[in-house]
Amino acid sequence: MKKIIALLLAAIMMLSLVACGGGNDEPAVDETQTIKVAAIETAYGSEVWANVAAAFTAETGIEVQLTTDNNLEDVISASMQGGEYPDVIHLATGRPAGLTEQFIKDKAIAEITDVLSMTVPGEDKLVSEKISGGFTETSLTNPYGDGKTYLAPMFYSPCGLFYNAKLFEAKGWTVPTTWDEMWALGDAAAEEGIALFTYPTAGYYDAFMYALIYSIGGTEFFEAVTHYEEGVWDTPEADTLFAILDKLAAYTHKSTPAQANNQDFTKNQLMVMQDQALFMPNGTWIVGEMAEAQTTLTNDFGWGMTALPAVEEGGAGYSYCWFEQAWIPAGAANIDAAKQFVAFLYSDKACEIFATAGAIQPVNGIASMLEGDNVMFYSIYDNGAKAAMGNFAAYTAIPGIDNTTVFFEPVNSLVAGTLSIDEYKANIVSASEQMRANLMG
C-alpha cells in the first residue's frame, strides 16, 4: 500500500519587520525547503525511514516528503514519466522491474562522488571516512568504470564460511587463513569422520565464488570474469580457481548434492551444526533460519563466521557482501539538498535508527551498535577481511544458458563425481563466449 508521509518538523520561521528609516519595509521570508524521498518497503518496514527522515529534518531544517511501498516502481513510475522525480530513491539493482538498471543504462542518475567529500550533517567526519573500505569501489556504485560514484551503498549483509565455534574450541583447531591450512584441517577432520565442507544448495556458490575470485586476482580478475572477457579462462588465475574448486569438491560431504535442493537444504546446514562438516557458505540470515533447529541440538554449538582464506600466506581473505543502493535521479529538482540527505544516511543517528530494524549500514565500527551474533558477523571487515562486491554483467537472454546453470549448479556434479573439472571449465568457456556476444549496454 502506498504510504506518503509528509514530515514537517522544522520550526516555523518567524517573520520579522525591521524599521529602515522611513523606507518601505519588506518581510524577510525564509521558506523551508522540502525534498521528496522514495524508498522501497522491505522487511525493515516503513517506520524506520520515517524516523530517519524526521532526524534529518531536525538536523538540517530540510523537510522530507516520504513515499514507501513494497512495489515502489509502480508508485513512482507514472510521475517520473511526466518529468517529476523523487529527489532521492532507495531502490537496489536486481529487482524484477529493473528500474534502477534502466536509469543506469540511460545515464539518468546524478553523480554523487562529491558526497564522499561532504561532512556528515551533525558530525565532523567526512562521508568517505564513515563508509567502510571498498563499498564505493565497485560496479554496483560506480557502474560506468570511470572512477565516479553514482549509487550510494546501503544495508549490507556479509556472507562467509559458517562453522561451529564450540567444536573448534574443543578440538583446539585454528580457523584457516590460507587454503593450504584449509586442506590440512580437512585431513585432520577426516580422521575424526568429519567432512571439511558442505553447502545448502549449489546456488550458495555465487557469493562463495565471487569472494574466491577476488582472493585469487582482485578486482581486475573479478571484472574480467564477470564481463566474460576473451581469454580470461586461460590465465594462471583461472587455473588457480579451478584447482581450488576441484579440490574442495573432494573434501565436500558426499551427501551434500542429494540434499542440495529447496526441500532438503536445511539438512546440509545441519551438517555443520551437528559436527558432520566443518564449513558451509552462507549469510547472516542463517541464525534466524536455523534458530528452531538449534534448540534441538545435543552437541555443544555456537555460530562462528570467517572470510574465505587467502590463496597465499600474507594475502587477503575476502567476504562477499550483498548490499542495496540509494541514488539521485539526474532530473531531480533539489539535487543539492538530496546530497545532504544521502550524506546523512551514514550519520551515527541514522545508522542507529536503521539498526533497530535490522538494516545495517556499511560504516566503520558498526559492530559497536549491534548485539549478539551480529557483533561477530558485522565486524568481519573490521578484523582484516576485505569486501568482495559485484556480480555478473547482464546480457540479453540466451536459450538454455544462465549464470546459475553454467557456473553454480554444476558443483553438484563435481562433488558427485559425474562431471570432471575439465568438462566444467569447457562448459564455462563455451557459455562465456555467448554471454560476451550478448552483453547489454
Which sequence ranges carry the predicted segments?
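Extracytoplasmic/periplasmic solute-binding protein
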Residues: 139-154, 159, 183-231, 268, ...
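Short, solvent-exposed loop/beta-turn-alpha elements that line the ligand-binding surface or hinge
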Residues: 111-130, 217-240, 293-298, 310-317, ...
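C-terminal capping/gating helix-and-loop segments adjacent to ligand/active sites or protein-protein/ligand interfaces
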Residues: 227, 320, 358-365, 379-437
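Hinge/lid segment of periplasmic solute-binding proteins
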Residues: 96-159, 183, 306
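Conserved N-terminal structural module of periplasmic/extracytoplasmic solute-binding proteins
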Residues: 6, 20-106, 122-128, 175, ...
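Extracytoplasmic/periplasmic substrate-recognition and gating elements
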Residues: 54, 58, 81-82, 170-171, ...
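Glycine-centered hinge/linker elements that transmit conformational signals in sensory
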Residues: 187-189, 227-260
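Extracytoplasmic/periplasmic substrate-binding proteins
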Residues: 101-102, 211, 243-334
